[in-house]
Swiss-Prot record:
Superkingdom field: Bacteria
The protein, known as: Putative membrane protein insertion efficiency factor
Keyword terms: Cell inner membrane, Cell membrane, Membrane
The family this protein is said to belong to: Belongs to the UPF0161 family.
Pfam family, one: YidD
PANTHER family for the chain: MEMBRANE PROTEIN INSERTION EFFICIENCY FACTOR-RELATED
Topological relation to the membrane, as annotated: Peripheral membrane protein
InterPro entries found in the cross-reference section: Membr_insert_effic_factor_YidD
Gene Ontology cellular component terms for the protein in this record: plasma membrane
Segments of this protein annotated with the region Disordered: 61-81
Protein role: Could be involved in insertion of integral membrane proteins into the membrane.
Organism: Pseudomonas putida (strain ATCC 47054 / DSM 6125 / CFBP 8728 / NCIMB 11950 / KT2440)
Length: 81
């Protein structure tokens, strides 16, 4: 199911995005962020993170570096170490 949710993002990244100028104000780009968020957090949480990120990508936001937050399992394992 997760792989199926990633197909439209991949289509956008490789078929549509190269035809348009680079408009994303963030690094990584919003499509890369969405792909990584869904891959790491699953469809629901990753999708929510992607929607929030798209909501922040507008001309009045400065943008900048905005990585996907780590998945909960990686947070707890780094704390335990």
């Amino acid at each position: 199911m997760r792989k199926l949710a990633l197909v439209p993002i991949q289509f956008y990244r490789y078929a549509i995005s190269p035809l348009m100028a680079n408009h994303c104000r963030f690094f990584p780009s919003c499509s890369c962020y969405a792909y990584e968020a869904i891959e790491n957090h699953g469809i629901w949480r990753g999708g929510w993170l992607a929607v929030r990120r798209l909501g922040r990508c507008h001309p009045w936001n400065d943008g900048g570096y905005d990585p996907v937050p780590p998945a909960p399992s990686s947070r707890t394992s780094s704390i335990a170490e």
